[in-house]
């Protein structure tokens, strides 16, 4: 049974375009299925998480990451008697707006768009789901419920100060109450993302030999699991060791998140969802100690993995590809597919730049490489 402060699909604020409910799915399940059926969701399987897709079959990509986030989000929401369908749906959609080549691609595209209000993957997720996906005759986008769109836009907290152009534009027709916190389910999806990416980026980085178990000594709360497992299983293999460490880490983080969130709910005597939205802090959270550990882990990953020689070398090539594609399309808009070219308002530079950015952002790693080789490169790129 759902808690009184859960997002109840029977009490959803509905969709921008009215639709008749189905008898065999609730509204959030329906949204989940719509997201899974989008082209943007399928393309995630060929978009970088940390390692380029072709570097190894077992490294995570944006799709496998999103699936892992969704399982954590669903488990946490269920335990707290919240809507696991809503938490899962927001988690599945949270990375739809990412560019090819991970954060390197996003930084490069944001730099290209500096004169045109920049690029934000979060806003791009909203744009994909409300405009760019063309699956219905009656409207653009996939017409998701208010709660799912709110969660996608605000899962990292209220949007204050300068608001992204597309979010502001969309908000005029469908007010997402940007200055308040999102539902508890959306907050869960955001922290499930943290749990998944720090755990699995550590796993993939050890698999890629960018870091080793000795370097994990810098993270005492993780190293204690390494020491304990080596003591208990004398002949444990390195591959099995990292799986066990990650399993224990995920369990530890979820348990901590559940404990602190229950404490917050009891302390605030929360009885309805509006009380969650109107708090001055997020109700779903880790303990102070765990937040500190997570912050240290993110710093460790940034310095030891994302800035490593291997990742930096790849990132430079990815940046070159994204910037090269942006320039060549801006110089000759006729290189865009006809259906994309039709989206440009006359020959106005700003509109042209936004359409080019939307097109590049939707590319997979391999398609971006293919386009670059065909349109820009004098030296053929096959892999990094």
UniProtKB/Swiss-Prot annotation:
The keyword Hydrolase applies. The keyword Hydrolase applies. PROSITE patterns: HD. Pfam families: HD, HD_assoc. Keywords: Hydrolase. Residues 62-198 form the HD domain. One of its GO terms (biological process) is dGTP catabolic process. SMART domains: HDc. One of its GO terms (molecular function) is dGTPase activity. It comes from the Bacteria. HAMAP family: dGTPase_type2. NCBIfam families: dGTP_triPase (TIGR01353), PRK01286.1-1 (NF002326), PRK01286.1-5 (NF002330). PANTHER family: DEOXYGUANOSINETRIPHOSPHATE TRIPHOSPHOHYDROLASE-LIKE PROTEIN, DEOXYNUCLEOSIDE TRIPHOSPHATE TRIPHOSPHOHYDROLASE. Belongs to the dGTPase family. Type 2 subfamily. This is Deoxyguanosinetriphosphate triphosphohydrolase-like protein. It comes from Rickettsia africae (strain ESF-5).
